[in-house]
C-alpha cells in the first residue's frame, strides 16, 4: 500500500456522531461480539438533495472520545501532543478527531480490522503509547491487566512491517505463558488480516520438528515463550540481526518465572538499532535495571499508578482453623455465591464435550483429509463464546490453589460434591488445557480450579468471583489473582480463606494496598461509640468491602454442617483421601520455599489473634450465638478461677504450687496489660509512628517497589530532588515503607540469593575460577571421580553466559540432513517458499516381459550417462579427471614404483 493511501484515511471514512457510541473497551485483545449498527442520521458524503440516503452499513464507526473522557488536564495535554504530532506528519490527519484510532495515522486495512473487532475508541494506554511507538521510541508501559496493552503494541507493529519481506525475522513478541502467547498470536492474526505478513507461534510442549519447519520459512513475526525461542535459537544457530521490533509482554511475570538469563541472552543477539517495548502491570527494581540495560532512552508511560486493584472490587477474608479450609470453601460456594449443582444433562453434555476437538486448526485439517477421502464426519453443535463484556455464567468463579496437587485434590472434591468444575495447571497437556478453558468460557462449567499460572494470560475477559483457597505469600500475586474480576467497570467479589500462619501475609497485604483490616469487634465498638454520641435516630454505618479488608469467620453452626459433609465425602471416597495426602506433602514444600513475612507483621499478627480475630464475619449479619458467647465470657471473668489441680482439693501441694505461680505471673500480666492500654491511647492520640502508619497515611504512594525519584532518574522527564535528604545516605530510625513493598515484589529472598549478591570475588575477572575438586566414590565405576563431572553440562553462548548443553543437541542438524536443506541464512531469497529435493536415485531395472521395457531402458541409459550407479551396469569413465582423482593416481603410482622398481637379479 502506498503512502498516499495511508495518508488519505480520514478523508475516506464516513464518521458517525459521537453520541451514538459508548465508552471505550478496556479489554486488551478479547473478541467483541457487539454489532456495529450505523446511525439513522448518517448520510453519504455527497447525497442528492431530493432523496434521503440510506445508512451505509460499511461505514466506519465514530472513533473519537466521548464527552466524559478526557476531562483531565493531563489527558488534554496528551491529546494535544498526539494531534500536533500527526498534523505535522500527516496532512490529512487534521480531519480526524484527536485521540481516535484514525488520528494515529494507521493504514486503512488496520482501521477496518479494528472495526471488525468492535473497538470504537482507544483505551488510555493505547492513546499514550501508540504515537510514541510509531515515532520509533523505546517505551516502558505500565497499566493494569485488562487495559488494552496487547493492541497497544500489535497495531504499531503491523503498521511498521506492512507487508511480507524475505530475509529473516523482523518482530519478536515474548510472552511469559503459553496461554498468553496463543492469545497474542490470535490478536496478531486478526489485526493483520488483509496483509501477506507471516506470523508463527512457538510455545513449549509442541514438536521441535514442527518448530524447525516454522523457523525455516523465515516469518515476519514470531510470538513465543522465552524458553522455547532460546532453545530454537541456540539449536539452529539462528541469526536475529534482522529483528527491528521486540516486545516484552508482562515483563514482570517474565522475571518472576526465571527468564532473566534467557532475556539477557536474547538481547545480546539482537541488533543495536532495534526498537524495544516493555509492558508490565508492575515495575520492580530488577525490571528497571533490565530496562536501563536493554532499552535506549526509554519513555515511561504509567496509568493507574495510584490504585493497585479495581475500585469496583469487593473483598472478604474468612478465618479458618487447621482442618476446616475445605468446609469453608464448600460454604462459600453454596451459601455465599449460591453456586448451583450440576444436573445429569449438564454432566452428560460435559462428557460429550471432552470428545470433541477444540483446536480449530486441527479440526480444519481433519475436515480436509476426510473430505478428500469422501467420508462423512459427525459434527458437534458448535458452542458460541459469549461476548467479552458478558459473564460466561452468572456464578463463574476461579479458585486459586498453591500447587498442581491441590488442583487435582480440590477438583475431585468439588466434583464429588456435585459442582461442574474445570481445572488448569502448568504441566497440563496443551490440548487438555484448551479443552478445560473452552468448557469454562462457554458456560458448561461454573468453577475453574487453577494455580498461579492462570493469574495472567488465560483468555477470560470477565469473571464474577475469585476465591483464594490459600492466601499467597506475595501481595503482587494477590493483585494479579483478584485482577481477573471487576474488569471493564463490572463489579466483582474476591474471597480469601486465611489461617493463623497466613495472617502475617494479610498484614503485609494491608500495608501494600494501604487499606486497613476491619475486625468485627472493631466495627461493633465503632457502632457503640456512634450510638452513644448520636441524639436522633441512629443509623448504623454501612461496611465498605472495597476500602477495608473485612476479616471474620463463617457462622459456626453452618460451618459444622459443611464439615460433616466434607468428612463424609472423605470417608466414602478413597481417591480423595489419597489426593489429600499428596496435596499435604506438596503444601509442606510450598511453605518451605515461599518467602517469609515481615517481622513487623509477625508481631502485629499476635496482637490481632488475641483481639477476637475469628468472630463471625460482618457479611453474615448479627451473630446468633452471641448470647452463648457472652455467658461463656461471664464464666471466664468469675472471681474464683480454679484449675484442674484445685477442683478436688485433695493434694494441698498442688494448690500451693498454683498460688505461688499466680503470685509470680501477676506483675508480668499487670505490666503487659498497662503497656497495651498505653499503646492504644497513644495510637488514638496519634503519637506512634511505624511502618503501617507510614503506609496508611501516605498520599499518592504507588507501591510498585521502585521510588518515584528512581523512576524519574531511570527514564525521561526527571525532576529535581524536592528534599534536602539524599536517600542514598539518609538512615531512618525505622525501616521505610519501600522495604516491605520491595519484599512483596521481590522474586526470591532465600539466603543463597542474598549471599550470592553480597559476594565480592576479585578472581572472577574474565570468568576464570579455581575449581576445587571434590572426589567421591562411584559404585558403578569402582573408583573415585570428580563430583562436578556428574553435574549438568553447559555450553558457553555468544554472550558468555552458560546455557544447558541440551539446547544444542544436534537435532536440527539431523533434521536438516534428512531433508537435504542448507543451513539457515538471512540473505537468501525465500520468495518461492518451497524446498526442492536434489536426491538422485537409480531407476528400476528394465524387464523384457513388461510393457514399459523400452521406457525403463531409456531411463537407465540416461542415469548411467549422468553418473548414477545402476546395478549390473558399468558407469562410463569420465574423460577429464578431477584433481582428487589425479592426486590419488599419483600416490598409487609412487607406491607401485617403490615396491616394484628394485634392481633385478641378473645385475648381480
Swiss-Prot record:
Q: Where is this motif: Q motif?
A: 99-127
Name used for this protein in its record: ATP-dependent RNA helicase DBP10
| E.C. numbers | 3.6.4.13
Binding of ATP occurs at 143-150
Q: Which CDD domains match?
A: DEADc_DDX54, SF2_C_DEAD
Q: Which reaction does it catalyse?
A: ATP + H2O = ADP + phosphate + H(+)
Task: Quote the record's domain comment.
Answer: The Q motif is unique to and characteristic of the DEAD box family of RNA helicases and controls ATP binding and hydrolysis.
**Which residue ranges have biased composition labelled Acidic residues?**
17-43, 66-79
What Gene3D superfamilies has UniProt attached to this entry? Answer: P-loop containing nucleotide triphosphate hydrolases (3.40.50.300)
* GO MF annotation: an example: identical protein binding
Tell me the enzyme class: hydrolase
Region annotation (Disordered) ranges? 1-84, 352-389, 821-885
- The keyword Ribonucleoprotein belongs to this UniProt entry's keyword annotation: no
The residue ranges flagged as biased composition, category Basic residues, are 373-382
Composition-biased stretches (Basic and acidic residues): 844-854
Lineage, broadest ranks: Eukaryota, Fungi, Dikarya, Ascomycota, Saccharomycotina
Q: Which family does it belong to?
A: Belongs to the DEAD box helicase family. DDX54/DBP10 subfamily.
Q: Name one GO cellular component term.
A: preribosome, large subunit precursor
Functional note? ATP-binding RNA helicase involved in the biogenesis of 60S ribosomal subunits and is required for the normal formation of 25S and 5.8S rRNAs.
A Gene Ontology BP annotation from the UniProt entry: assembly of large subunit precursor of preribosome
Amino acid at each position: 500500500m502506498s503512502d498516499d493511501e495511508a495518508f488519505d484515511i480520514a478523508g475516506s471514512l464516513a464518521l458517525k456522531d459521537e453520541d451514538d457510541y459508548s465508552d471505550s473497551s478496556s479489554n486488551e485483545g478479547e473478541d467483541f461480539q457487539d454489532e456495529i449498527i450505523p446511525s439513522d442520521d448518517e448520510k453519504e458524503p455527497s447525497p442528492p438533495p431530493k432523496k434521503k440516503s440510506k445508512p451505509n452499513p460499511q461505514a466506519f464507526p465514530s472513533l473519537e472520545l466521548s464527552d466524559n473522557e478526557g476531562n483531565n488536564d493531563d489527558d488534554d495535554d496528551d491529546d494535544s501532543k498526539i494531534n500536533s504530532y500527526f498534523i505535522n506528519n500527516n496532512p490529512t490527519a487534521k480531519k480526524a478527531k484527536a485521540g481516535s484510532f484514525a488520528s494515529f495515522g494507521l493504514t486503512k486495512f488496520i482501521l477496518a480490522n479494528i472495526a471488525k473487532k468492535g473497538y470504537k475508541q482507544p483505551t488510555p494506554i493505547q492513546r499514550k503509547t501508540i504515537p510514541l511507538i510509531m515515532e520509533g521510541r523505546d517505551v516502558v508501559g505500565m497499566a493494569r491487566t485488562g487495559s488494552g496493552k496487547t493492541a497497544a503494541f500489535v497495531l504499531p507493529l503491523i503498521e511498521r512491517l506492512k507487508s511480507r519481506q524475505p530475509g529473516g525475522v523482523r518482530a519478536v513478541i515474548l510472552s511469559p505463558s503459553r496461554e498468553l502467547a496463543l492469545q497474542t498470536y490470535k490478536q496478531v492474526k486478526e489485526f493483520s488480516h488483509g496483509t501477506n505478513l507471516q506470523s508463527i507461534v512457538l510455545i513449549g510442549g509442541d514438536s521441535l520438528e514442527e518448530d524447525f519447519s516454522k523457523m525455516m520459512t523465515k516469518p515476519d513475526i514470531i510470538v513465543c515463550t522465552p524458553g522455547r525461542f532460546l532453545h530454537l535459537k541456540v539449536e539452529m544457530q539462528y541469526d536475529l540481526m534482522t529483528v527491528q521490533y521486540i516486545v516484552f509482554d508482562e515483563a514482570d511475570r517474565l522475571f518472576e518465572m526465571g527468564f532473566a538469563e534467557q532475556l539477557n541472552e536474547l538481547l545480546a543477539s539482537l541488533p543495536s538499532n532495534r526498537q524495544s517495548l516493555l509492558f508490565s502491570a508492575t515495575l520492580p527494581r530488577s525490571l528497571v535495571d533490565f530496562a536501563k540495560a536493554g532499552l535506549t532512552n526509554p519513555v515511561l508511560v504509567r496509568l493507574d499508578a495510584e490504585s493497585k486493584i479495581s475500585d469496583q472490587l469487593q473483598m472478604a477474608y474468612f478465618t479458618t482453623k487447621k482442618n476446616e479450609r475445605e468446609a469453608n470453601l464448600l460454604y462459600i460456594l453454596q451459601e455465599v455465591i449460591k453456586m448451583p449443582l450440576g444436573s445429569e444433562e449438564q454432566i452428560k453434555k460435559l462428557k460429550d464435550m471432552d470428545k470433541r476437538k477444540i483446536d480449530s486448526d486441527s479440526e480444519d485439517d481433519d475436515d480436509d483429509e476426510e473430505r478428500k477421502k469422501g467420508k462423512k464426519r459427525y459434527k458437534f453443535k458448535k458452542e458460541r463464546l459469549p461476548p467479552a463484556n458478558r459473564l460466561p455464567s452468572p456464578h463463574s468463579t476461579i479458585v486459586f490453589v498453591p500447587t498442581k496437587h491441590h488442583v487435582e485434590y480440590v477438583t475431585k472434591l468439588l466434583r464429588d460434591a456435585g459442582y461442574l468444575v474445570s481445572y488448569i495447571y502448568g504441566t497440563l497437556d496443551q490440548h487438555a488445557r484448551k479443552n478445560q478453558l473452552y468448557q469454562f468460557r462457554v458456560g458448561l462449567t461454573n468453577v475453574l480450579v487453577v494455580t498461579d499460572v492462570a493469574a495472567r494470560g488465560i483468555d477470560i475477559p470477565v469473571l464474577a468471583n475469585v476465591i483464594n483457597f490459600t492466601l499467597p505469600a506475595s501481595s503482587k500475586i494477590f493483585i494479579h489473582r483478584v485482577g481477573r474480576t471487576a474488569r471493564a467497570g463490572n463489579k466483582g467479589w474476591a474471597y480469601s480463606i486465611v489461617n493463623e500462619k497466613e495472617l502475617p501475609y494479610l498484614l503485609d497485604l494491608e500495608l501494600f494496598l494501604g487499606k486497613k483490616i476491619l475486625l468485627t469487634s472493631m466495627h461493633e465498638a465503632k457502632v457503640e461509640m456512634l450510638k452513644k454520641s448520636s441524639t436522633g435516630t441512629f443509623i448504623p454505618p454501612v461496611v465498605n468491602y472495597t476500602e477495608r479488608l473485612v476479616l471474620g469467620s463463617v457462622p459456626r453452626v453452618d460451618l459444622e454442617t459443611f464439615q460433616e459433609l466434607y468428612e463424609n465425602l472423605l470417608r466414602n471416597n478413597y481417591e480423595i483421601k489419597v489426593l489429600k495426602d499428596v496435596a499435604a506433602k506438596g503444601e509442606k514444600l510450598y511453605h518451605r520455599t515461599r518467602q517469609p513475612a515481615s517481622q513487623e507483621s509477625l508481631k502485629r499478627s499476635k496482637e490481632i489473634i488475641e483481639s477476637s480475630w475469628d468472630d463471625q464475619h460482618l457479611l453474615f449479619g448479627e451473630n446468633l450465638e452471641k448470647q452463648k458467647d457472652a455467658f461463656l465470657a461471664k464464666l471466664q471473668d468469675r472471681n474464683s478461677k480454679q484449675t484442674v489441680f484445685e477442683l478436688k482439693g485433695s493434694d494441698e501441694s498442688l494448690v500451693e504450687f498454683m498460688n505461688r505461680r499466680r503470685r509470680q505471673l501477676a506483675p508480668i500480666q499487670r505490666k503487659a496489660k498497662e503497656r497495651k492500654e498505653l499503646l492504644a491511647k497513644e495510637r488514638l492520640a496519634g503519637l506512634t509512628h511505624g511502618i503501617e502508619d507510614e503506609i496508611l497515611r501516605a498520599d499518592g504512594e504507588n507501591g510498585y517497589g521502585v521510588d518515584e525519584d528512581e523512576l524519574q532518574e531511570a527514564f525521561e522527564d526527571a525532576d529535581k530532588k524536592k528534599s534536602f535528604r539524599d536517600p542514598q545516605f539518609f538512615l531512618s530510625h525505622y525501616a521505610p515503607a519501600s522495604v516491605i513493598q520491595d519484599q512483596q515484589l521481590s522474586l526470591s529472598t532465600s539466603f543463597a540469593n542474598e549471599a550470592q549478591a553480597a559476594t565480592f570475588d576479585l578472581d572472577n575477572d574474565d570468568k576464570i575460577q579455581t575449581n576445587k575438586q571434590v572426589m567421591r566414590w562411584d559404585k558403578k565405576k569402582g573408583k573415585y571421580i570428580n563430583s562436578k563431572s556428574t553435574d549438568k553440562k553447559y555450553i558457553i553462548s555468544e554472550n558468555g553466559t552458560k546455557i544447558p548443553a541440551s539446547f544444542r543437541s544436534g537435532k536440527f542438524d539431523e533434521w536438516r540432513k534428512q531433508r537435504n536443506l542448507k543451513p539457515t541464512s538471512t540473505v537468501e531469497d525465500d520468495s518461492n517458499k518451497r524446498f526442492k529435493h536434489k536426491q538422485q536415485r537409480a531407476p528400476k531395472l528394465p524387464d523384457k516381459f513388461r510393457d514399459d521395457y523400452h521406457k525403463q531402458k531409456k531411463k537407465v541409459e540416461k542415469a548411467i550417462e549422468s553418473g548414477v550407479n545402476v546395478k549390473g551396469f558399468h558407469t562410463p569413465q569420465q574423460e577429464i579427471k578431477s584433481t582428487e582423482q589425479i592426486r590419488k593416481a599419483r600416490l598409487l603410482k609412487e607406491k607401485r614404483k617403490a615396491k616394484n622398481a628394485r634392481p633385478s637379479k641378473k645385475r648381480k
